[in-house]
Regions:
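Solvent-exposed alpha-helical segments and adjacent loops
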Residues: 1-434
């Protein structure tokens, strides 16, 4: 290979492995092999579709995801309880009867996300769902398959007939109505989706900062990190920038990936909560720590409460995420280790799905015993929301303020209506007087 030349610049969120978010997508585009959307058998195997999404899709006030589903199936011999069950991320959504008299098999659905939906009985019957970077949509076709009976004197032979089910390639799912907005730092989206670097699939918005004389372990860590991001996006990192001069980062509008050490220009104790220096480091512990990555503590809970000095005789590594001091829409992730064995632990952790699942928050400490993550320090936001969505987002974590805001809005609306009625009434009276 003599070289790579980019013929057309990449666009944000156009990674080959991600579902398009600028338009509706057909199921044919989501297939990874030819026969994926069909199944056969007495009880057909489930049909599954992977939905790999950008982790910064803003779904806080989403009513659901629109899906236009077209499907075909072998009709049951009689009208019975045969059905199609739809599940998302192993959570049941809804079932539809396989009616033997049905002519057109087309459904226009709205997949619920975050909040439960109300059915016609005004009861919450659909569970709240949460979309992640990797999701699985599953269709189970359940056939009753009645078998004729016999007796000792009258033996009946029966040949089971296979059932065939197909999800149409022209079925569509639409994520184009949602904004891109996320709270960071969150090492979970870096470890499992390569975000924010994977926003540009070719890493054209990424600047890698390496030591002037990187060790073999640091090079291995770098290659593992870039390879992991490429496996998530489906595209090689052909346009990333790399430097060994920490002073160059001030003039770059890019997300920074630091390998081995933090440049002196970025050392800010208010943003960096862990420094790996030889075998000694310190960690600021928050007021309250949550083991579940899905729980985001409030500002008070994230405030450092104690400072713990750690002296470790064993190897140690760390992954740290914080906001770039040069651009409030850019992020920094540092991959640090204290020794060659620490680099090996870090590289292995980035290659281990179980250890990556344990990374979240702003700091992940990696030792021989495993991965420990903390969420501490300042939160910043990357992406764009319209002003009205910003208001709802700001009030979402403050229900009392939301109630006060709603009450004031109702009072103002009532006052406006009252004034309008008064004006109309006066006009009518003046016309009557004339």
């Amino acid at each position: 290979m003599d070289g790579i030349k980019t013929l057309q610049p990449r666009q944000p969120y156009d990674a080959p492995n991600w579902v398009r978010t600028d338009r509706s997508v057909t199921f044919a585009e989501l297939k990874t092999y030819e026969q994926q959307l069909q199944s056969s058998g007495l009880v057909p195997d489930a049909i599954t579709v992977a939905l790999n999404l950008p982790p910064d899709l803003y779904l806080l006030r989403a009513n659901g995801i629109d899906m236009d589903l077209k499907y075909r199936y072998t009709m049951p011999p009689v009208k019975d309880s045969s059905r199609m069950d739809i599940s998302l991320n192993d959570q049941f959504l809804q079932s539809f009867s396989l009616n033997s008299s049905q002519d057109v098999n087309k459904l226009i659905l709205r997949l619920p996300v975050l909040q439960g939906l109300l059915d016609g009985k005004s009861e919450v019957t659909i569970p709240a769902l949460r979309l992640g970077a990797v999701n699985q949509l599953r269709f189970d076709f359940q056939y009753m398959n009645p078998m004729p009976g016999g007796s000792i004197d009258n033996c009946i032979t029966f040949q089971p007939v296979q059932n065939h089910v197909v999800i149409g390639d022209d079925s569509t799912i639409d994520f184009s109505k949602y904004y891109h907005f996320i709270a960071l730092p969150d090492l979970r989206v870096f470890a499992n989706a390569g975000f924010p670097y994977s926003r540009m699939a070719d890493l054209s918005d990424t600047l890698v900062v390496v030591p002037k004389a990187p060790t073999q372990g640091q090079v291995a860590t770098l290659l593992q990190a870039l390879g992991g991001i490429g496996s998530q996006t489906g595209l090689a990192a052909i346009n990333l920038q790399m430097t060994d001069d920490g002073n160059q980062i001030k003039n770059k509008d890019a997300d920074l990936l630091l390998i081995g050490a933090i440049p002196s220009s970025l050392k800010d104790d208010t943003k960096i909560n862990l420094l790996v220096e030889a075998t000694k480091s310190w960690v600021k512990m928050p007021m309250r720590h949550y083991d579940l990555a899905s729980i985001y503590p409030d500002d008070e809970a994230r405030t450092p409460n104690t400072r713990t000095d750690i002296t470790s005789s064993g190897p140690m590594a760390a992954v740290i995420g914080f906001q770039s001091p040069y651009n409030d829409q850019r992020s920094v992730v540092a991959l640090l280790a204290d020794s060659p064995r620490g680099n090996e632990l870090l590289t292995n952790a980035l290659n281990d799905s179980g250890k990556r699942a344990a990374m979240f928050g702003s700091v992940a400490v990696i030792r021989e015993s495993g991965v420990n993550s903390l969420r501490v320090g300042d939160i910043y936001y990357v992406g764009h929301l319209p002003w009205f969505e910003r208001i709802w987002f700001a009030l979402s974590n403050h229900p009392i303020l939301l109630a006060i805001f709603a009450a004031i809005s109702i009072v103002l609306l009532a006052w406006v209506l009252w004034r309008m009625l008064r004006i109309i009434s006066r006009r009518r009276l003046s016309l009557d007087d004339e």
